[in-house]
């Protein structure tokens, strides 16, 4: 069942405020691609933070990867949003960002719940509501671990 689209948050709303402070631990619930319904039409609302972009659009198989066909609107402080009707689960997409130097850069969604298998790197629309997590044993073991004196892994992502 598709969720009803909520109003676009104002810059003073708590999730946006916490995001700006670096304290929104559930930013994934707002940013990324979310299946929903708007005015009775099923589709996806996309949100991304691109504070220095001149423009952002959504590209994918659904628009033949055409920049500008689905332009996003900056709703507040570098947060861009767009509802696109007709997009379904597993549809592949990227953000096409126009830089201040007018270059087009294609970026995967940093909040994507699903991605293509390498060497491809597109994001996929995926609804995690109702997903059955299978990590209860790991979480139980993790709660017993001494995090201060245990080794840690650091990954560099580009």
Region locations from a protein language model:
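Short proline/glycine-enriched turn/loop motifs at strand-loop junctions of beta-rich domains
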Residues: 49-56
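The feature marks proteins involved in alpha-glucan
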Residues: 1-41, 74-156
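Short beta-strand elements bearing conserved aromatic residues within extracellular beta-rich modules
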Residues: 56-58, 93
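Short loop/turn segments at connectors of secondary-structure elements within structured domains
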Residues: 52, 66, 89-91
């Amino acid at each position: 069942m598709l969720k009803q689209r909520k109003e676009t948050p104002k810059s003073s709303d708590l999730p946006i405020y916490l995001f700006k402070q670096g304290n929104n631990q559930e930013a994934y619930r707002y940013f990324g691609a979310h299946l929903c319904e708007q005015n009775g039409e099923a589709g996806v609302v996309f949100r991304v933070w691109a504070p220095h972009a001149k423009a952002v659009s959504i590209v994918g198989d659904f628009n033949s990867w055409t920049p500008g066909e689905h332009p996003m609107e900056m709703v507040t402080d570098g947060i861009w949003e767009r509802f696109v009707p007709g997009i379904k689960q597993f549809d592949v997409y990227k953000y096409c960002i126009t830089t201040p130097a007018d270059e087009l850069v294609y970026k995967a969604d940093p909040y994507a719940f699903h991605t293509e298998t390498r060497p491809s790197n597109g994001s996929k629309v995926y609804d995690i509501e109702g997903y059955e997590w299978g990590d209860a044993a790991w979480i139980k073991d993790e709660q017993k671990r001494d995090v201060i004196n245990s080794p840690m892994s650091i990954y560099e992502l580009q």
